[in-house]
């Protein structure tokens, strides 16, 4: 029989940099998970994506064991990296902070495809373009 999921914890952690300090420690401590076990496994699984923030969904079972699924980095993080900016615009409709090409948007859409609710690559690109627009990044 399958183990019963007791709790699902969702976190966004920098790749390869999970440690027992907040926010990881308290979130997993409340669920009764072996924090160091999670940190070592997460860091090993994400070390090649260093510098990106990785969303992770941790399923905690009744017997205190856990499994976790890493997702693709959030679109704004990938857009900022592609555009070479630290943060988006405070007034995206007035101040444009950077420009990305259609090819960069296509690349981000292909990366994000497993996590996006899009039927095809064109729809995924439109989602990414909308995110860019709301950050003050123009798409050419």
UniProtKB/Swiss-Prot annotation:
Part of the ribosomal stalk of the 50S ribosomal subunit. Interacts with L10 and the large rRNA to form the base of the stalk. L10 forms an elongated spine to which L12 dimers bind in a sequential fashion forming a multimeric L10(L12)X complex. One of its GO terms (cellular component) is cytosolic large ribosomal subunit. GO terms for biological process: translation. It comes from the Bacteria. SUPFAM superfamilies: Ribosomal L11/L12e N-terminal domain (SSF54747), Ribosomal protein L11, C-terminal domain (SSF46906). Pfam families: Ribosomal_L11, Ribosomal_L11_N. This is Large ribosomal subunit protein uL11. Belongs to the universal ribosomal protein uL11 family. InterPro entries: Ribosomal_uL11, Ribosomal_uL11_bac-typ, Ribosomal_uL11_C, Ribosomal_uL11_C_sf, Ribosomal_uL11_CS, Ribosomal_uL11_N, Ribosomal_uL11_N_sf. Keywords: Methylation, Ribonucleoprotein, Ribosomal protein, RNA-binding, rRNA-binding. Forms part of the ribosomal stalk which helps the ribosome interact with GTP-bound translation factors. One or more lysine residues are methylated. One of its GO terms (molecular function) is large ribosomal subunit rRNA binding.
């Amino acid at each position: 029989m399958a183990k019963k999921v007791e709790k699902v914890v969702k976190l966004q952690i920098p790749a390869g940099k999970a440690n027992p300090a907040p926010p990881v420690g308290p979130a997993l401590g409340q669920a009764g998970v072996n924090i160091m076990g999670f940190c070592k496994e997460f860091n090993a699984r994400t070390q090649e994506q260093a510098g990106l923030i990785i969303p992770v969904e941790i399923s905690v079972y009744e017997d205190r064991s856990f499994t976790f699924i890493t997702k693709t980095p959030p679109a704004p993080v990938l857009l900022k990296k592609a555009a070479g900016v630290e943060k988006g615009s405070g007034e995206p409709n007035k101040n444009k902070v950077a420009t990305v090409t259609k090819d960069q948007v296509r690349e981000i859409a292909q990366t994000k495809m497993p996590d996006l609710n899009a039927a095809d690559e064109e729809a995924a690109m439109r989602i990414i373009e909308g995110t860019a627009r709301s950050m003050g990044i123009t798409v050419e």
